[in-house]
Structure formats: structure tokens, C-alpha cells
Amino acid sequence: MEESSMAQASLICLLLSFSIIMLSNAADISIDCGSSSSHIDADNRTWVGDTDFVATGLTSKFVPFSKFPAELTTLRYFPTGETNCYTNIPVEKGGKVLVRTRFLYGDYDEESTYPTFDVVYDGKHRYSVVTTTFETVTESEAIFIPENGNISVCFFRTLSSKTPFVSTIEVRRLDDSMYTDLGPKEGFILQQRIAYGAQELVRFPYDPYDRIWMPASVFASHLTSSATSIDTTGADNRPPEIILRTSWSQKDMAFYDIKLPFSGVTFYIVIYFSEPLSLGSDQKRSFNVYYEDKQVGSDLIVPPFGAVTQASLRDVVKTELAYLTFEATPDSTLDPLINALELYVISNSGGSGNGTNSTSTSGGGSPSPGGGSGSPPSTGGGSGSPPSTGGGGGSPSKGGGGGKSGGSNNGDGGTNKASEDEKSADSSGKSGEEKSSSNLALPLGISLPTLLSLGAGGWGVWKYFIKPRRHPESELPLKQNISLQVNMGNATVVNAGQ
């Protein structure tokens, strides 16, 4: 009898272990496209071959000029068919997932064609992929809620002369409490995810959800947190602590950005703030954030020391002149700051890829209005050593915000949300920072007037101009501008006004 009970207990433990393994497999998976074998990378991520997920296409392996992880040196390409799909990728039904595809062309076909094509996530959320060099790692990423226990990732030929391909597919399970602004039928198509002041990109293991945060280290006032630890629970999206240890702080600047793929797209922006200094009783940092004339978050931003708050804005349509401004309150003694930012296009409806392969070879087709479009950022290889946080230049739909939510305000055409941790300031320490009541305006991606180099993985053309927020457009000193052509994290001055 005792042996029978022990056998039953062992069987139960075995079944529980199997269930945990199955749940883990449904949560996170890394597919090495074009490979039939598995391997473990330097950051202890397990990569599996792609033969269980795709039945079409051909494989290629090449030796790149630069050093790349093994998973980026193989790929699968699709010389025939209008749409080719990876299917039966396991996920948790109804749970939020992040799906990332990466592309390293490497001139595998020796044609120097620089492929362009679309990727469609789960038959709904579409993004246009543009490769620009042999050695540039291009990526696309979407956050959405799967309706079933498996998803598809499809590659759609947009030009008959261009062959779609893919190097890796990564699926990461997100906590249900994250990205509460995401509606059940929507997708967030990543445009930018930036850690201001960071020296290197940040991802797993420093971000347990394996989001990739690009560094932005430029000639701005760069602050490093003196907090022993930073509580990240005050922000719904759970930014990793390491990106909250650096920030930009600046005044009297405004930037506008043409980074989003085209005017008319609807987007979601979320910004993270953490006070780096233990403020004295005579010090205060408080400000509002505006995208054009729409407030980001419905509450005043008072960054908490040793904690984090987030402010977000969604359902805003991108216009030709898009700028982000941080406006200090009259009683603020310190400049506004920013730690990190995420920017997404909101996908509301499907693309053309429905999880099945199409044999048409005619090509053509345009991106779905609900999806994103444009050239994704370049991120290179793995995370390597811990990202540096010191020195250098500066860097709802439905649902509430993290911490103490400010609710919503739809009167300005966008949905606002802010979360704030109002911990009392430690008056024992005083900052050497100068008193200032001023405005900080940053590009959604990167830039400051003295910027000559850039590490935020942005692209497109950025411009800045000095602009007091409340001045009418006719008074903007547009001659004081500088255009930066951004590619692969480097900036080149192409035009400067007087």
C-alpha cells in the first residue's frame, strides 16, 4: 500500500514536471531558422531548429564578415510563393506575447539584392522589412494576445524580384499585468525602445522578458542613480532596473521627429521616469510631458527616488510635425529627465498572411493600414557583458497605469495614463545640480544640438530646434536646426542652419 502511494506520488510529480516543461515551452521559444539542430548561446538561451515549424523554403548558411552569433549565420529563404509561413509555434492562449523576427542578409545569394518584404504576425499584425547592408541585423517585433494555443509568422512577397528570408524567430511570454493599454484584438508593432544614458544595448538576462533596449548616449546632461535599489513595480510594463539607473536631463530644447513610417499611423508611446538623486528639502523635480499639444499621462510627473513611474499616450495619429516636449513646472528647481521610452504603431486589423502558404508568385501588395511599416532597427548580437551605466554622454484602450494610475483623458484625441509613486524625498542628501525651471524636449529616438555620434539604433532624419512650448508655429526659429542622417547607430551631419 505504501509502495503504491509512493508510486502515485512519483507519477504526480512527473506529470507536474511535464506540465511545467510544456508551459515553459509554450511560453518562450527561440527558433534558429535554416538550422536543423539545437544549441545554447552565450546568454544561456536554447535555440531549436526550424524543421518542425515550416514546410517551405530553402536554407542557407554563410560566414559573415563580422562576428555574429551562430543563430544569425543560418537563414531560410522563400524563392517561390507569395506567402510562406512558420506555423504551430506554441504559445499560451490568451496570454500576452512578444514575437521578434531578425534578419541578417549577409549576401547569402551573392546577388546584392537587399531584400524588402512584409512579415505578418498571427495573420493580423504586419510590418515591412527593409534590409540595407550585408552585415546589418534588421529586426521586427510585435506584442499581441494570441487567440489560440499556437501562432504563425508569415513572410509576404511585396516585389516579385525580392526574396523574403528570416534568420531567427523569438517568442517571449509577457506577464498579463504588462502593457495594459493593449486591446484584445490589437498589436503593438515596435518602432523604438530606448534606454537613455545606457552605453550598450540591454536585453536578457538584465531584462527577464528579453526586450531589447537600445542605448542612447549623447552629449546631454547624464545622470546616474544613487539609489541602492530601484523598485520597478510602480510601472505596469516592468522596465528592467538597469535602464532606470541612467537618464538624460536637459532644458530649453524641442525636437521633432519623422521617425514613424508615415503620417496617419496611430501610435502608442510610454515613457519611464526614476529620480536619480536623493533630493534635499529645497529641491524639487516636477514636469509635464507633451507630444505636440497632447499631454503624455494625465498626471504631473514627479519621478520617485528608488522607484519608477510611467506615463503613456495612445490612439494618437502621427502628423508631419511630431515633437516631444518636457515642460518643468514653475516651482521645479531641477530640470526634467527621461530614463527610457517605448514607441509602437498600433495594429488594429489583419495583414494578408493568415497562417497558410500561398503558391502565387506574382508578388505585390501593400502593408495593412493596421500594421507598422518601415526600416527596423539594428541590434547586432547578444547582450554580452553587463551594460555600462556610468560615464559618457547623456543618454486604452483599456486598463490602468502602473503604480497610482491617473486614469484617462480623451479630450485631446489620445488616451492618457500616468502612474506615480509619491515617496517622500530623503532630505539628508543634496544634489550638486543647478536650480532650473526649464523645458526638455527630446526626439522620440535621439538627438541634441551638439550631437555628432549616436548609439540608439534609430534611423531616418532627425531635426531639432529651440522652441519655447507655447510659442505659435510662426515664431519657431527654424533656422537653428541641424539634420542628422541616422543609420546603424551612427549619425552624420548633413545640413546645419545658421
Swiss-Prot record:
Region (Disordered): 351-439
InterPro entries from the UniProt entry: Malectin-like_Carb-bd_dom
Any Gene Ontology CC annotation: membrane
Name by which UniProt lists this protein: Uncharacterized protein At1g24485
Organism: Arabidopsis thaliana (Mouse-ear cress)
UniProt signal peptide: 1-26
Membrane topology of this protein: Single-pass type I membrane protein
Biased composition (Gly residues): 362-414
Residue spans, topological domain Extracellular: 27-441
Residues carrying sugar: N44, N150, N354, N357
Membrane-crossing residue ranges in chain numbering: 442-462
Topological domain ranges for the Cytoplasmic compartment: 463-498
Residue ranges with Basic and acidic residues bias: 418-436
Pfam family, one: Malectin_like
Domain of life: Eukaryota
Keywords of the record: Glycoprotein, Membrane, Signal, Transmembrane, Transmembrane helix
Compartment(s) where it occurs, according to its Swiss-Prot or TrEMBL record: Membrane
UniProt entry tagged with the keyword Transmembrane helix: yes
